[in-house]
């Protein structure tokens, strides 16, 4: 493509030189303007070919753990997570060795806006939390209030450790899209337009058992796909919170039955409403995942002993069933007294049982397969 672009520039230059000799003076400025515009467009095309940007956009159904997925991709808890819907505004995370946060000035902003460099993970989390909670609490009484828009630069794990085989000079960014309740809010529509060529990871709440709510979730999936535009072929569906089935006496049969039914239902619902993508939907990639235990696995391996012990405590309290056999083998209950060997055993078990490795591998393959379209 780069060769053809340069060839086109050469052809146009020859054509311009030839035709200019036969046109009156009044046409010369118009021809020159066309030349300048073509040169700018070709330079931009060549620059983007040499410096491609890979965008991963995250979206999901209600209470699907989308924000935890973003934190998993980053390898740190920097995006606010809550039981209720927290993703009120779009957050762009660009890869950099330096950490920074920008919260942009938006119409009527009631939260602190500005730029912070060399900021800690905890401070990023707190500032985003304050901006989002302020917006959520005031949006009904102030309908013209624009949602918060922010950009983080961060050395996220996705690029550092997941062994993505990307061309040199490829820039990578993660786009954490607003929750379904805020998709239509002022400011978010422009961000969603950026996802037309992105690889979209759609999280689905596997823990929901109510049949009416499941039907509602399927409708949400269809709506998300429609809002994002583009082909479902570039979407990766994650059946999140899949660990709930491990409590069943009939596991793994119950998990397998759920996965088969969920894939069938998602494909049927999408095919019914997006008939033009029938072939892409048939080849849809759906993976199992439990984002929180996978994230805890990474946090446990952190070299900061206090941070690591806190992650161990959360794993013990919330995911006892995943690590029961290891916990029974440990000499002490107090997580602060666990040895590095103890912590590594717990981390490995969480990573395996959360399907963290399978998710990472599928994501890597999906990016490699669709890379030309994604950039």
Regions found by a protein language model. Give the residues of each.
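Charged, amphipathic alpha-helical linker segments immediately N-terminal to NTP-binding catalytic cores
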Residues: 1-33
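Globular "head" domains of long coiled-coil molecular machines
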Residues: 39-337, 348-370
């Amino acid at each position: 493509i780069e060769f053809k672009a340069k060839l086109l520039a050469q052809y146009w230059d020859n054509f311009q030189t030839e035709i200019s000799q036969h046109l009156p003076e009044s046409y010369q400025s118009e021809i020159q303007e066309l030349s300048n515009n073509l040169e700018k467009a070709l330079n931009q095309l060549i620059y983007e070919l040499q410096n491609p940007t890979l965008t991963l956009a995250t979206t999901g159904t209600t209470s699907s753990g989308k924000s935890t997925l973003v934190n998993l991709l980053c390898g740190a808890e920097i995006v606010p997570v809550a039981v209720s819907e927290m993703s009120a505004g779009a957050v762009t995370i660009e890869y950099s060795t330096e950490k920074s946060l920008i919260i942009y000035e938006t119409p009527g902003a009631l939260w602190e806006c500005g730029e912070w460099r060399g900021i800690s993970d905890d401070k990023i989390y707190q500032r985003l939390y304050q901006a989002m909670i302020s917006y959520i609490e005031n949006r009904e009484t102030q309908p013209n209030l624009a949602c918060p828009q922010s950009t983080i630069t961060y050395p996220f794990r996705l690029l550092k450790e997941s062994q993505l085989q990307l061309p040199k000079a490829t820039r990578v960014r993660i786009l954490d899209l607003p929750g379904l309740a805020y998709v239509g809010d002022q400011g978010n529509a422009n961000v969603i337009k950026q996802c037309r060529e992105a690889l979209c990871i759609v999280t689905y709440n596997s823990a929901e058992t109510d049949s009416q709510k499941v039907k509602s979730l399927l409708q949400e999936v269809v709506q998300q796909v429609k809002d994002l535009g583009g082909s479902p072929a570039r979407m990766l569906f994650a059946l999140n919170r899949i660990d709930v089935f491990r409590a069943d006496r009939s596991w793994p049969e119950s998990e397998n039955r759920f996965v088969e039914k969920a894939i069938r239902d998602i494909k049927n619902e999408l095919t019914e409403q997006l008939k033009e993508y029938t072939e892409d939907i048939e080849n849809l990639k759906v993976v199992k995942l439990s984002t929180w235990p996978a994230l805890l696995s990474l946090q446990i391996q952190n070299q900061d002993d206090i941070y690591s012990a806190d992650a161990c405590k959360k794993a013990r309290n919330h995911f006892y069933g995943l690590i029961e056999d290891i916990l029974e083998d440990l000499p002490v209950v107090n997580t602060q007294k666990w040895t590095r060997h103890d912590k590594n055993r717990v981390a490995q078990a969480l990573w395996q049982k959360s399907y963290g490795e399978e998710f990472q591998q599928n994501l890597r393959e999906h990016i490699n397969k669709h890379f030309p379209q994604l950039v």
